């Protein structure tokens, strides 16, 4: 999309026609988060970038903001992000943050470690931050940041990729999944934990099956549905609109 105010525009999904301010041109059953190209934001254009994002955040399908530290060599609490955090607070939408491993070797893990979320969470206590991928493989650190900060939640997307057979998956990833289970129990608050897929990198039915074996059954309804509807607060109206 083209810039209207001279700032950096969001990275958008490409499932529909180009963005239009009147109709937004999004499929009726799709919600999305605006992607942030942090390296393109400067002190000079940070406020203008927030204005660009505000155009999109008014879209009923826009559920939040997504940062990509690690892929961008910018820490979560860098001041260039602050106007976006203020925008998230004003519109009551969460800020999701890529954490943990990166998909290619050029990514820099010091920026994507889940401990980096702590500083932003303390500086902006009225903004909800979502640690995407549970900080994989740093589950302990992600759980501690979420445990310490009332405004931090976790999603379980993209932990295992591909399409292995279920029993092979459990056998191959037994220790990995045991650690995940241990640290989710350490957090102890399953209202802070959300299912996520990272589609198309995962087989959705298999991934649901895997997460259902990690999360105690009594919390399935919260982890697979209720928490996302509460944390991404615009989902409810979107579901009503779609008849869901």
Regions found by a protein language model. Name each.
Residues 1, 181-182, 186-194, 201-244:
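Mid-to-C-terminal alpha-helical segments outside catalytic/metal-binding sites
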Residues 3-4, 39-41, 72, 101-105, ...:
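Active-site environment of divalent metal-dependent phosphoester hydrolases
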Residues 6-111:
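Active-site gating/metal-coordination segments in enzymes
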Residues 13, 20, 54, 118-119, ...:
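Active-site phosphate/pyrophosphate- and oxyanion-stabilizing loops and adjacent acidic/basic residues
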Residues 19-25, 145, 183-187, 215:
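Short, conserved catalytic or adaptor-binding loops enriched in Gly and charged residues
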Residues 34, 72, 157-159, 221-229:
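A generic structural motif
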Residues 46-55, 168-171, 235-240:
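Short, surface-exposed amphipathic charged segments that create phosphate/polyanion-binding patches used
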Residues 62-64, 77-194, 242:
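Catalytic pocket-lining loop regions of alpha/beta-barrel enzymes
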